[in-house]
Amino acid sequence: MNDISMMGYPGMGQQQPQPQQAQQPQQQPISMQPHTMMNMMNTNLPPPGMMMGGAGSNTGNENMINHGLMSGNPVSGIPNNNSHQLLDQLINKNPNNMGIPQQQQDSLAAQMQLPMGGMPMGNGSAHNGNVGMNNNNTGGNNNIPMGNANVLRNNNIIGNLGGSSLAGGNMNSGMPGISTFGNTPGQLAAPPIQPNANANNPMYHPHLEDPSLMNNPIWKLQLQLATVSAQSVGQPNIYARQNAMKKYLATQVPPQNQTQQQAQAQSQIAETSKSLVDCTKQALMDIMAPDDSKLKGMSAPNTASTTTNSTISTPTTSKIDMNNSREQPSTPSLLLQHKKLSQYSIDEDDEVENRMVAPKDTKYNDQIWHAIDLSNLQIFNISPNLMKYDFLTRLYLNGNGLESIPSSIRNLKNLRVLDLSHNKLKELPKEIGNCYQLKYLYFFDNQITTLPWELGNLCNIQFLGCEGNPLDKELLKILTEKSFTGLIFYLRDNRPEVPYPHDRKFIEINADGEPEKEYDTVQEAERNLSSDMQKKSFTMLSYNTLCQHYATPKMYRYTPSWALSWDYRREKLKEQILNFNTDIICLQEVEAKTFEDFWQPLLEKHGYTGLFHAKTRAKTMQSKDSKKVDGCCAFYKTSKFKMLFKECVDFSGLWMKHKKFQRTEDYLNRAMNKDNVAIVMKLQHIQSGEIMWLVTTHLHWDPKFNDVKTFQVGVLLDHMETLLKEQNPKQDVKKYPLVICGDLNSYLSSSVYELFSTGRVQHHHDGKDRDFGYFSEDNFSHNLALKSSYNCIGELAFTNFTPSFTDVIDYIWFSSQALRVRGLLGEVDSEYVSNFIGFPNDKFPSDHIPLLGRYEFLKSNNTQNSNSGSRKV
């Protein structure tokens, strides 16, 4: 964009060309023209304390938040101090000590003496009207040169740096709970640089005690990135500045006649704009790179070319010297171990970026900025209110005086990058473990001695920066031997047991459908059940057991490896199900072979008999492979029920046999290839003589196919109506005892829930503009009076618990005019759940929890020999 005023800076419109100095070349690349560079720095500099992450934005307009202070707008002709200091850093303090040509430096320095509009710069008093700006002319001396890192560490100037002239006292006005100290209103104190007393302490820098660590590639990476981090100390909002520079450079096209000297200078500026996160990605990409990439002439793309979309992109950059260590005999297994443990590619797009370019249909996607940069602002306290910004993906708190982080950081579950380096932290809050999407966690140069076990939840971690802390030697050993992911897995697998305070309570429901009494266990409730209630009621369980083929270490990285093993989970499932001792057991996600070899023989020993139906894809496979396909199964106690009818159905097959079947485009393209199934049983309750119908199913999982789920339920309910009418044409189908349970993969707000609860789907977005023939024309309507079992006490907090999804998707529906709920298994203890980011774990062997209820038959003549079509309720 040529007009700077269009980028959120109205006082900086296009300027008339300035006369060029005689000694300058007639043509300069745009990135090297002094006036243009000054405009660029003012233009793209985000507001203080904020760095935005709107995708695809290069203007900085739509995704910037202006606090009214330090915005970069010139006030009364006063130039922006941020621009001068940043330009000074870019010219004189480049990281590779490869200076910009002296002629160019002189020209840029001369330009720095002029305001943006070409008017003469006022003296210090002219800044009095520039509210929130610090005109400390000596502040620039507090900045650490972006040069040789050894100078930084050897001269003990890494920690406790003073304020910069860029740090206005009101820099974060409008930000919740930011506490800073300053000498006067509108200014931060600029104390002298204090030496870092721990710079030569081997407890903080173990390579000083054990020089062999210098040959360890993991520790070399720690030192390399700790050096990069140290270079930013004392430079307020360093991430925001670097991001602004990258966005500017991405818009520039080098001229064709660019000299080598000019190209070198431009490359130098691009190098300066690289952040710690960029350097981390560069290093990790090098570790993950193929060995023969150099031979093929391959090199990773330049960072600047891959970071134009947003501040949360994952660019790749050129290789570093660690690639050479791959050839050393002592390092290949270590480097490859990181690759093996990571199980994902460093350069794959962030999930959040994919959401940003997708249709904006959520509150999260309407948010246009996702990062806050509070680096090097002399902040000594962070209010928990900051943690209410749960949409944040990046939070930079490095270079302050923080001694603690609020436990409410657990709310930032979208966080990808967290920089806590160069503070005074003695521990990390265990709640950071809830930020399971963290990829880059930095806490260089603090006072941390150990890591909370909860960090084992950080299953997506790609780098953990810990150098400069007196960290426990055992943890350091694991880090240097097994890399970052190995350390996380160690914390995950060796976490002490979290006590389970109590079993899920069983809630007794009275005849009016209201909770009456709570029992500590299902067994206790059973012991207190009256003999009359036992004769006219039954219990049933519905449980998605998580098929072992889906429970892979890659999918469930947050679960300890021993707790994820099928042997352990199978025994836990067995223990749970047998302890519940229900009259009916319905299971989903059961492998065919597991049913035959484990569940069927086990439950037959305990007085059950059952039926299994695999998903339809098993029909297309050879016998051996078909045994690995999962499906649904239903068991009943032979002492309680007698089976009168059974049927295994698949939804596509039912619809194709329907008398009103239509081959619509949506059916053919969206529903026909889904292989979900259901089991239907007609059972007679032996003690009461009542007849009931039992259905268990597992609907399609993908939320992009909610219309297909509605279609599947519509087919199922239509089929049940047909069966009920065939069995007894004179009886109202509403008065048949019917229970439908399973994993419906549908929210409470879904069209599936609406269809079950109201009998039709009316103008619901899930099925909008979809054509499933007869069902769509009739709004999928049915005449069954169904009610969710948990409706009388309120649906549970969740039935499926994973880091990325926690909600109710499992249900037990019953015919409310023929059955009455008399008891329900309650929710999992919320305090216990707060210690985890998902199931399975050592106590819960599936990512779903079981649903359990007791159901009473209402008085009726609904017996096997009944011909009556009516009864009173």
Curated annotation (Swiss-Prot):
GO terms for molecular function: metal ion binding; poly(A)-specific ribonuclease activity; RNA binding. It catalyses: Exonucleolytic cleavage of poly(A) to 5'-AMP. Mg(2+) binds at residue 589. Residues 14-29, 299-318 have a biased composition (Low complexity). Keywords: Cytoplasm, Exonuclease, Hydrolase, Leucine-rich repeat, Magnesium, Metal-binding, Nuclease, Nucleus, Repeat, RNA-binding, Transcription, Transcription regulation. GO terms for biological process: DNA replication; DNA replication checkpoint signaling; nuclear-transcribed mRNA poly(A) tail shortening; positive regulation of transcription elongation by RNA polymerase II; transcription elongation by RNA polymerase II; traversing start control point of mitotic cell cycle. This is CCR4-Not complex 3'-5'-exoribonuclease subunit Ccr4. Its EC number is 3.1.13.4. SMART domains: LRR_TYP (SM00369). It is found in: Cytoplasm; Nucleus. GO terms for cellular component: CCR4-NOT core complex; Cdc73/Paf1 complex; P-body. Residues 319-332 have a biased composition (Polar residues). Residues 1-29, 292-332 are annotated as: Disordered. LRR repeats lie at residues 391-412, 414-435, 437-459, 460-480. Disulfide bonds: none annotated. Its cofactor is Mg(2+). PROSITE patterns: LRR (PS51450). The gene is CCR4. Belongs to the CCR4/nocturin family. Acts as a catalytic component of the CCR4-NOT core complex, which in the nucleus seems to be a general transcription factor, and in the cytoplasm the major mRNA deadenylase involved in mRNA turnover. Ccr4 has 3'-5' RNase activity with a strong preference for polyadenylated substrates and also low exonuclease activity towards single-stranded DNA.
